[in-house]
Regions:
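Pyridoxal 5′-phosphate
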Residues: 1-501
Length: 501
């Protein structure tokens, strides 16, 4: 495997790093080679882990071992059902351990559509449980999944602003959170913020935000979709109880188990009593023609229907593997990698990096977003893919308000003399960024290749721009090179091959 960020720790840390190397190197797809516009084949560099991570080999191995025993849960009468039920329950316990949740006070349950499904469940449930509190406080940094559900179920959603560092926006402004709590005293149901921005990777001070929320009688909800794979989480048992988190929501596909469900971890009393938002099989004690009795048992009452058993077991395997490594070790490694990436990109004046880059003041994890000045983000992403086989993401990353604010801020700093209306119009036209995001398998060499590719794009801008046409949808399409996806893989041919061999 390629060289990773260096470490000076010894002893138990050496063992942890050995496990890290083994687990990281097992990720499926690291050696994938694909044709590029030059006619060569090149190994893919996967820098899109914030969107979805690659599956770890250990997860695939666990699923392969489990699959012969597969059966539905909700029964222990036959061996397969008994085994599936036991391991499905173990996956719940592993979730609680991984986020540092008190097992006596907290429950974990799985939901179908990732963090989005989890946040919708949280908002719908708490709007019923807290009828006198019709305000939710969040921030402008949020992914739509930690914004729109609150808008749907609550009368008012307040979007707290970020701090401003020496160069750009930083983390959520604690003073803005406090002002919003004071202005809506007695009405705030909960504060819900992302632990780590899916755009900039900036880490928010969730413990301090929790203390503010609790001081005003509000709950603290953390969108951990991006945090879960990069930063240690301690939900319960903090030295200061005010720092404890009431609800954590995340997605399994963000933590090396694609195909696994979303997860809600919450204080039990918040989901006890009443009728759950989703009803069906498995969440009732009894049903008559004119009524039904929901079970009081958690997590069963929040998991109507047949669960994603295989996905949950895969998630449990991923969490246990990372638990064996230690999230502190992983965070240390990834911090070094982020510092390396920021250093290389910051050295290029033609690159605009979004969010304040002072990692001492505003630590980051997992992702950074940028643009080549004067080049459309879609073109930059297309060139990185077509000529270098570097997989990045572009556009607004389901965080339109945040991206709009940062693009406008950058344009205002570089384009003197524009009126407010002209600036707004230009920002809308250029709204979007390129995002490079890292996983446990990202190496120093991957970062170096990205930096070299960007340097080449800057040096040969005219050449690259001449190779592309703009499509009616605003995408950039190479004039001569076409990636034939069906030649690489398609479901029909894969089935036909199996059937005829």
């Amino acid at each position: 495997m390629q060289q990773r960020a260096s470490s000076t720790h010894v002893g138990s840390q050496s063992a942890a790093h050995a496990l890290l190397e083994k687990v990281a190197g097992s990720a499926i797809g690291l050696d994938l080679e694909l044709p590029i516009a030059t006619g060569e084949r090149r190994r893919r560099i996967y820098l899109d882990s914030t969107a979805s991570t690659l599956r770890l080999g250990v997860v695939q191995d666990v699923l392969d071992r489990y699959q012969p025993y597969y059966a539905n849960t909700h029964s222990t009468v036959h061996f397969g059902a008994r085994l599936s039920t036991q391991e499905y329950r173990w996956a719940h316990d592993m979730v609680l351990d991984f986020v540092g949740a008190d097992k006596q006070r907290c429950t974990a349950f799985f939901v179908g559509s990732g963090t989005t499904g989890g946040m919708n469940r949280v908002a719908a449930t708490l709007s019923q449980r807290l009828p006198g509190r019709d305000v939710v406080i969040t921030s402008i940094m949020e992914h739509h999944s930690n914004d729109l559900p609150h808008r749907k179920y609550f009368k008012t959603v307040v979007h707290a602003s970020p701090e401003y560092g020496s160069t750009s926006m930083g983390c959520v402004d604690l003073k803005a959170i406090e002002r919003a709590l004071e202005a809506n005293k007695g009405r705030v149901a909960y504060v819900s913020v992302t632990g780590v921005s899916n755009v900039t990777g900036i880490i928010n001070p969730i413990r301090e935000i929790a203390a503010l929320a609790h001081a005003h009688g509000a709950l603290m909800v953390v969108d951990a979709a991006q945090m879960i794979a990069h930063v240690p989480i301690q939900m319960s048992g903090n030295a200061n109880p005010a720092h404890d988190i009431d609800i954590v929501v995340f997605s399994g596909h963000k933590i090396y188990a694609p195909g696994s469900p979303g997860v809600v971890v919450a204080r039990r009393e918040l989901f006890e009593g009443g009728v759950p938002v989703e009803v069906g099989g498995g969440m009732v004690d009894d049903v008559w023609l004119d009524r039904f009795t929901p079970t009081a048992s958690l997590p069963d009452r929040e998991e109507a229907g047949t669960p994603n058993i295989t996905g949950a077991i895969g998630l449990g395997a991923a969490l246990y593997a990372l638990h064996r490594i230690g999230m502190d070790t992983l965070f240390e490694e990834e911090t070094e990698l982020m510092q390396l990436a920021l250093g290389k990109l910051s050295a290029m004046p033609e690159i605009a990096i979004y969010g304040d880059t002072d990692m001492c003041r505003y630590p980051r994890a997992g992702a950074l977003s940028f643009n080549v000045r004067g080049m459309h983000h879609a073109l930059t992403a297309a060139i990185l893919n077509d000529y270098f086989n570097i997989a990045v993401r572009n556009q607004c990353f389901c965080a339109h308000p945040y991206v709009r604010e940062m693009v406008t801020e950058a344009l205002a700093a570089s384009d003197d003399g524009l009126t407010a209306a002209e600036l707004e119009a230009l920002a809308e036209m250029q709204r979007g960024m390129v995002r490079a995001s890292f996983g446990i398998y990202t190496t120093r060499e991957d970062v170096a290749v990205l930096a070299a590719a960007l340097a080449d794009i800057i040096a040969r801008r005219d050449f690259y721009e001449q190779q592309y046409d703009v499509t009616p949808t605003g995408d950039y399409q190479h004039k001569t090179f076409r990636f034939q996806s069906e030649a690489q893989f398609n479901i029909r041919d894969a089935v036909d091959t199996w059937l005829t061999r």
